[in-house]
Amino acid sequence: MFTFYMYLAPIVAGVLIGLNWLLAKSNPNIDKAGPFECGFTSYQQSRAAFSVAFILVAILFLPFDLEISSILPYVTSAYNNGLYGLIILIIFLMMLVIAFILEIQLRVLKIERSYDKDRSDSNYYDHEI
């Protein structure tokens, strides 16, 4: 069965590359055809703006995600670890909860809204052009 998949994987990859080559739109451009060098003239806007709140959520998500994934080995060996492993797990989870409560108290997770609360809909639509 392993030999079958060893032959099948390159065949599927070749078919997909061939389909892409046949069905892809061709949009030749002198900038695309040449080698990439610093300072070339861009033919479209290359940097799109995104919210700072997105970066904040991503930065806060990363440590908690890594810490939660470090709990997974305990799940597979909970029987062998016994009471000592359970106590270590509870201490670890308490540190996570305390860190999360601290972030909430410091208002790190408060994301500002993009609309103005003082502006009502009637004032928004009643101005003259």
Swiss-Prot record:
The keyword Membrane applies. The keyword Nucleotide-binding does not apply. GO terms for molecular function: NADH dehydrogenase (ubiquinone) activity. The chain crosses the membrane at residues 4-24, 48-68, 82-102. Signal peptide: none annotated. Its main location: mitochondrion. GO terms for cellular component: mitochondrial membrane; respiratory chain complex I. Keywords: Electron transport, Membrane, Mitochondrion, NAD, Respiratory chain, Translocase, Transmembrane, Transmembrane helix, Transport, Ubiquinone. It is found in: Mitochondrion membrane. It catalyses: a ubiquinone + NADH + 5 H(+)(in) = a ubiquinol + NAD(+) + 4 H(+)(out). It is an enzyme of class 7 (translocase). Its EC number is 7.1.1.2. It is a multi-pass membrane protein. Core subunit of the mitochondrial membrane respiratory chain NADH dehydrogenase (Complex I) that is believed to belong to the minimal assembly required for catalysis. Complex I functions in the transfer of electrons from NADH to the respiratory chain. The immediate electron acceptor for the enzyme is believed to be ubiquinone. Belongs to the complex I subunit 3 family. This is NADH-ubiquinone oxidoreductase chain 3. It comes from Candida albicans (strain SC5314 / ATCC MYA-2876) (Yeast). The gene is NAD3.
